[in-house]
């Protein structure tokens, strides 16, 4: 378990929203919708199974769940399999979620990113892919970098991951340096635990006005750690359902597949 001090250090790394916007006239989304919204959930948490997925299912929406291998427990496997069968995406969040040492108690050494090298990280991503395939039957998966960073032993592993063919797309953190959206380093804007439904809806509206893409990231929903309240999550989901005629809500890989096939949607943040 992370300590309170650790939670404060990672703060904004737990409830994230990714906002990518360019000029509205340059964007085209399915059905003439004005923006695309992706809902993602990290760490294979019980509250995602118990609260988030039922809320999404009730609204007819599909999300992406980035699972950590060592967080999976046998009694939950069938529930994750059922979620995938219902159209939710299962994504790769590595086996051990190696983050920088600064995010963990001093005694935790073995599964920090400093203790890894690039081959070790790619081997772990490959292993997690196999675990996911055993659950959902799919041969390709997207990836979310642990703690929003992509370092192993101080070396950026994205260049090697990019050419490895192991994952289709990567959700990271921070703004990219270029003007074109990089599907292997999708940028992120993070919000803290106090984010409300109104905060999230305002971000959606900003994306809609600019014709952009908003990727929303959660950890706990109404429980677990670094959580957003179930009420705030429900408000966002209700808003997305009510505006389905103007907002396209789909899993991460589905939206990124669309972006990849529509060059006019590949502009980076404005």
Regions found by a protein language model. Give the residues of each.
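Membrane-interface motif at the C-terminal end of an N-terminal transmembrane signal
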Residues: 20-25
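Catalytic domains of cell-wall/extracellular-matrix polysaccharide-remodeling enzymes
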Residues: 51, 73-75, 102-201, 232
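Active-site beta->alpha N-cap acidic-glycine motif
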Residues: 26-101, 124-150, 205, 246, ...
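Bacterial N-terminal signal peptides
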Residues: 9-19
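Short, histidine-centered active-site or binding-site loop motifs used for metal coordination
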Residues: 94-96, 109, 218-222
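C-terminal domain-boundary segment and adjacent tail
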Residues: 27-31, 60-63, 71-75, 133, ...
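N-terminal secretory signal peptides that target proteins for export/translocation
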Residues: 1-6
């Amino acid at each position: 378990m992370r300590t309170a001090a650790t939670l404060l250090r990672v703060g904004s790394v737990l409830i994230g929203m990714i906002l990518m916007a360019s000029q509205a006239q340059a964007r085209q989304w399915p059905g003439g919708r004005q923006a695309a919204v992706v809902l993602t959930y990290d760490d294979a948490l019980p509250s995602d199974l118990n609260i988030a997925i039922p809320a999404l299912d009730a609204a007819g929406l599909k999300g992406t769940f980035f699972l950590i291998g060592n967080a999976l427990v046998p009694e939950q496997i069938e529930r994750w399999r059922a979620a995938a069968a219902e159209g939710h995406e299962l994504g790769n969040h590595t086996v051990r979620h190696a983050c920088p040492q600064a995010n963990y108690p001093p005694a935790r050494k073995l599964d920090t990113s400093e203790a890894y090298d690039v081959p070790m990280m790619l081997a772990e991503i490959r292993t997690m892919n196999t675990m996911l395939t055993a659950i959902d039957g799919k041969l390709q998966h997207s990836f979310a970098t642990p703690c929003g960073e992509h370092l192993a032993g101080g070396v950026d592993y994205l260049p090697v991951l990019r050419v490895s063919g192991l994952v289709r797309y990567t959700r990271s953190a921070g703004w990219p340096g270029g003007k074109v959206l990089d599907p292997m380093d999708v940028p992120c804007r993070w919000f803290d635990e106090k984010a409300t439904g109104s905060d999230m809806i305002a971000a959606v509206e900003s994306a809609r006005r600019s014709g952009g893409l908003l990727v929303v990231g959660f950890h706990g929903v109404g429980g677990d750690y670094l959580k957003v309240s179930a009420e705030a999550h429900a408000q966002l989901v209700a808003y997305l359902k009510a505006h389905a005629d103007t907002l396209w809500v789909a899993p991460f890989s589905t939206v990124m597949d669309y972006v990849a096939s529509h060059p006019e949607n590949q502009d980076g943040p404005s």
